[in-house]
C-alpha cells in the first residue's frame, strides 16, 4: 500500500513576514492520518485551526490566503509547495502571525525543515485526486488547465517584458516522473520590481521584502549581487507557486497542469471548478505502490530523486 506521510518530530523556526515585516514563529508538528495540512493561529486569544482547502482560500491578490472565522494565514504557497514536493499528507503548522515567514523567498527552507524533522509513513492509504476530464479557467489571455494524466506534470508560461527575464526563458515543462522537485524547483525565489516594492510599501505591504528573500529587478537588470540560482529561476518560481496553490485541494493531483500567466487567483479558481464537477475527478489509492505513477510525491523510499 502506498501510505500517507507526516513528519517524525516537531521542528521550529523563526522568520519575518513578507508584508508585515514582523517576526513570526513557525512550528511544524506531526499529525494523524487523514488530518491534512492544518494551519493554527496560536497567537490569537482563542487559537483558530484553518485546514488547507480550496474553499478556504479568500484573498489571492499577492499570495494564497486561508481564511476562517475572521482569522487569516497568508503566503502559504511556498510551504504547501514543499509539502507537495516531499509527499507530506498530514501536518500541523503553528504560526504566531497572519503570514507564514518568507524565509529566503523559495521553498528551500521548508524542505530543509521537513527533512530535518524526518518523514514518517503512516498506516493509512495515501489518497490522490485523479483528474478524469479536462477543466479550464480563462481570464482574458490568461488560462490554467488540468487534463487527465497518470502522474503529475506541469507546463507554465510567463510573459514579463523585461530584458533580464527575456534572457532566462519564459516557458518551462516539468514531469515529476523524471525531475527532482528538491533539486530543480525548490530553490527558486520570488521576484519583484523595485518600483512596485516602493508602491507596496506606501500601502503598508512588502515591509519584510529585501534582496535576502527575493530577486529584485530595476527597469533593466537584476539588482541582487549573487544573481540567479537557476538559469530560468523566474518561471521556476511561478511553477513552485502553482505546485503549492494546487496542493491546497487536499491531496496530490494525478493530472497535467498547463498555465499561461496564471497566478494564485486563477489557480484557486481552477481547483474550485474541478471540485464543482464531481464527474471530472475521483479519489484513488494504490494497494500496490509499484502500480502508482512515478513522481515526486509517490516514491516510497524518498520523496525526491
UniProtKB/Swiss-Prot annotation:
UniProt KW Flavoprotein keyword: no
Keywords recorded for this protein, A-Z: Hydrolase, Lipid A biosynthesis, Lipid biosynthesis, Lipid metabolism, Metal-binding, Zinc
Record's keyword annotation contains Lipid metabolism: yes
Gene Ontology CC terms, in alphabetical order: membrane
Catalytic residues identified in the record: 264
Lineage top rank: taxon: Bacteria
Name of a matching Pfam family: LpxC
Functional summary from the UniProt entry: Catalyzes the hydrolysis of UDP-3-O-myristoyl-N-acetylglucosamine to form UDP-3-O-myristoylglucosamine and acetate, the committed step in lipid A biosynthesis.
Name under which the protein is recorded: UDP-3-O-acyl-N-acetylglucosamine deacetylase
Organism: Paraburkholderia phymatum (strain DSM 17167 / CIP 108236 / LMG 21445 / STM815) (Burkholderia phymatum)
Underlying gene: lpxC
Amino acid at each position: 500500500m502506498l501510505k500517507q506521510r507526516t513528519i517524525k518530530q516537531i521542528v521550529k523556526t523563526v522568520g519575518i513576514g513578507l508584508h508585515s515585516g514582523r517576526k513570526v514563529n513557525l512550528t511544524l508538528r506531526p499529525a494523524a492520518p487523514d488530518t491534512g495540512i492544518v494551519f493554527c493561529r496560536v497567537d490569537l486569544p482563542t487559537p483558530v485551526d484553518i485546514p488547507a482547502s480550496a474553499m478556504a482560500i479568500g484573498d489571492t491578490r499577492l499570495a494564497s490566503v486561508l481564511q476562517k472565522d475572521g482569522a487569516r494565514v497568508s503566503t502559504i504557497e511556498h510551504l504547501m509547495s514543499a509539502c507537495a514536493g516531499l509527499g507530506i499528507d498530514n501536518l500541523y503548522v503553528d504560526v504566531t502571525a497572519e503570514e507564514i515567514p518568507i524565509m529566503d523567498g523559495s521553498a528551500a527552507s521548508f524542505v530543509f525543515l521537513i527533512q530535518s524533522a524526518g518523514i514518517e509513513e503512516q498506516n493509512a492509504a495515501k489518497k490522490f485526486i485523479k483528474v478524469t476530464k479536462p477543466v479550464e479557467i480563462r481570464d482574458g489571455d490568461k488560462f490554467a488547465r488540468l487534463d487527465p494524466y497518470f502522474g503529475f506534470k506541469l507546463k507554465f508560461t510567463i510573459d514579463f517584458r523585461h530584458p533580464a527575464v527575456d534572457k532566462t526563458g519564459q516557458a518551462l515543462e516539468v514531469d515529476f516522473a523524471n525531475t527532482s522537485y528538491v533539486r530543480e524547483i525548490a530553490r527558486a525565489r520570488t521576484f519583484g520590481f523595485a518600483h512596485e516594492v516602493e508602491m507596496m510599501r506606501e500601502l503598508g505591504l512588502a515591509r519584510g521584502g529585501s534582496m535576502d528573500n527575493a530577486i529584485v529587478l530595476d527597469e533593466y537588470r537584476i539588482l541582487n549581487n549573487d544573481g540567479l540560482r537557476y538559469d530560468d529561476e523566474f518561471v521556476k518560481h511561478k511553477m513552485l507557486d502553482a505546485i503549492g496553490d494546487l496542493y491546497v485541494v487536499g491531496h496530490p493531483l494525478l493530472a497535467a497542469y498547463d498555465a499561461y500567466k496564471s497566478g494564485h487567483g486563477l489557480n484557486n479558481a481552477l481547483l474550485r471548478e474541478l471540485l464543482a464537477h464531481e464527474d471530472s475527478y475521483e479519489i484513488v489509492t494504490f494497494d500496490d505502490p509499484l502500480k502508482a505513477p512515478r513522481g515526486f510525491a509517490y516514491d516510497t523510499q524518498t520523496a525526491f530523486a
